[in-house]
């Protein structure tokens, strides 16, 4: 199996392992975190080995590259004589990243953009947040959360128009705008949208599992109930969940 893999086929597993690391951290399970970090490290070793077999680079080169990058980006640690406070450290960090982006743009014969370096493979919510933060650095931003809420209402109304028209592509477009605006609201509220959605997922899962267990205790199968009965069971589950918070 290993011999049949390439970078693209392994990439989904690498992403999955990174999420499992995050899951262990959120659960504050250090034993699990140790195991998941090992699994993630194996992914790094696997990719490095495949690259080595193509005479591209090896694991040592990966370690050397990140070491060099950390030294360049953290002069306040490795050259403390120049950086006396957090503000100058942050400025130096941003200047170094700007230099790296400019070098990459020149290498690729294109103009430098404030959005350079935001990976396209990031989860959509995370990428939206990063794009918005980059745009905000050059002043392209709302002053506070209030106009963002107005924008959400506007996008919701535009989505409704497309829904009423039965316009599939239009619904996709407007729903994307709405989600992007919701991420923007999260940013203005200083909330990580990925963390907020994970918490929402966990709450739904917790309440739905309680719904299933409660119905099972009554000898009922959710599949046999209509939506009215399921809504009533859901409300009971929410009440139970809120009482245990």
Please provide the spans of the model-predicted regions.
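Flexible "arm" and connector segments at domain edges
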Residues: 1-36, 42-175, 179-245
């Amino acid at each position: 199996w290993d011999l049949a893999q390439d970078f693209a086929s392994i990439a989904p597993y690498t992403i999955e392992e990174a999420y499992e690391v995050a899951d262990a951290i959120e659960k504050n399970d250090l034993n699990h975190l140790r195991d998941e970090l090992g699994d993630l490290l194996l992914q790094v070793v696997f990719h490095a080995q495949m690259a080595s077999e193509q005479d591209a680079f090896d694991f040592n080169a990966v370690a050397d590259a990140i070491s060099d990058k950390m030294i360049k980006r953290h002069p306040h640690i490795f050259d403390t004589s120049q950086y006396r406070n957090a503000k100058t450290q942050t400025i130096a960090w941003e200047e170094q990243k700007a230099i790296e982006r400019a070098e990459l743009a020149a290498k690729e014969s294109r103009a430098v953009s404030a959005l350079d370096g935001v990976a396209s493979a990031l989860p959509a919510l995370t990428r939206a947040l990063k794009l918005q933060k980059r745009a905000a650095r050059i002043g392209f931003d709302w002053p506070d959360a209030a106009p963002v809420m107005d924008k959400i209402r506007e996008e919701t109304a535009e989505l409704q128009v497309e829904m009423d028209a039965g316009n599939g592509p239009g619904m996709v477009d407007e729903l994307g705008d709405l989600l992007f605006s919701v991420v923007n609201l999260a940013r203005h509220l200083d909330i990580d949208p990925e963390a907020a959605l994970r918490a929402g997922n966990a709450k739904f899962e917790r309440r739905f599992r309680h719904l299933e267990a409660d119905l099972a205790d009554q000898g009922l199968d959710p599949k046999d109930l209509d939506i009215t009965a399921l809504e009533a069971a859901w409300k009971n589950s929410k009440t139970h969940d809120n009482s245990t918070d």
